[in-house]
């Protein structure tokens, strides 16, 4: 069982109250084991109960790094648009990240047997339902392409 997160006081809305939605995602979607909402600078804003505080913070930092790399690739090789999603395939499963509200991201860990289409769809639904409630105002958010 995870440890309750101290949520960023600068987050618009009540991010901590979204933890139950992350728990619901983990319990409803087959082979999804962990979920975290994070700020673009890698701060965990909310996490499923399947993550300890340390693991939530570690996953948030990793996911922020991957999103940053993806944005750099889009700026250099693409047309400078927003990064919608990144998927990292590991031997032990997948790490999926998706832009959420302004300055935030949703990251999910899934087992190898996960239906990635379903996981991505459920992530998109969750982002649509919560995106406007999980905005984080950061000094770089306007320049970064998040949200």
Please report, for each region that a protein language model flagged, where it lies by residue.
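Acidic, low-complexity cytosolic segments
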Residues: 2-32, 41-147
